[in-house]
């Protein structure tokens, strides 16, 4: 069932990025072969969302580089890093 939801989500994204390829009345692809060619690829710049990294949840947190620093918020210990945002962790 989850794959069905992903399929409809992908069709929604493609219909917004390439509106001329979709039939407005039925919501179906006019020319599906355009999306099956190897030359067609969605680059990250075409997607409308900017995802930011979330926190990794760990039982014990530690600094991963010299730029990392500890912050205590809402009773939890967080590690933040401006140099490497992928180092963000929170105590679980």
From Swiss-Prot:
* Gene Ontology biological process: mitochondrial translation
Keyword set includes Mitochondrion: yes
The listed locations are:
Mitochondrion
Per the entry, what span does the transit peptide take up?
1-54
* UniProt KW Mitochondrion keyword: yes
Could you list this entry's UniProt keywords, alphabetically sorted: Mitochondrion, Ribonucleoprotein, Ribosomal protein, Transit peptide
Taking the first listed entry, what is the main subcellular location of this protein, grouped into a coarse class?
A: mitochondrion
Give a GO cellular-component term: mitochondrial large ribosomal subunit
One Gene Ontology term of the molecular function aspect: structural constituent of ribosome
The highest taxon in the source lineage is Eukaryota
Subunit comment for this entry? Component of the mitochondrial large ribosomal subunit (mt-LSU). Mature yeast 74S mitochondrial ribosomes consist of a small (37S) and a large (54S) subunit. The 37S small subunit contains a 15S ribosomal RNA (15S mt-rRNA) and at least 32 different proteins. The 54S large subunit contains a 21S rRNA (21S mt-rRNA) and at least 45 different proteins. bL36m has a zinc binding site.
Q: What does this protein do?
A: Component of the mitochondrial ribosome (mitoribosome), a dedicated translation machinery responsible for the synthesis of mitochondrial genome-encoded proteins, including at least some of the essential transmembrane subunits of the mitochondrial respiratory chain. The mitoribosomes are attached to the mitochondrial inner membrane and translation products are cotranslationally integrated into the membrane. bL36m may be involved in a process influencing telomere capping.
Which family does the record assign? Belongs to the bacterial ribosomal protein bL36 family.
According to UniProt, the name of this protein is Large ribosomal subunit protein bL36m
Organism source for this protein? Schizosaccharomyces pombe (strain 972 / ATCC 24843)
């Amino acid at each position: 069932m989850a794959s069905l939801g992903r399929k409809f989500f992908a069709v929604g994204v493609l219909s917004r990025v390439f509106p001329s390829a979709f039939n407005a009345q039925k919501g179906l692809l006019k020319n599906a072969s355009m999306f099956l060619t190897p030359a067609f690829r969605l680059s990250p710049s075409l997607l409308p969302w900017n995802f930011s990294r979330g926190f990794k949840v760990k039982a014990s947190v530690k600094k991963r580089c010299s730029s990392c620093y500890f912050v205590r918020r809402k009773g939890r210990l967080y590690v933040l890093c401006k140099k490497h945002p992928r180092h963000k962790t929170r105590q679980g």
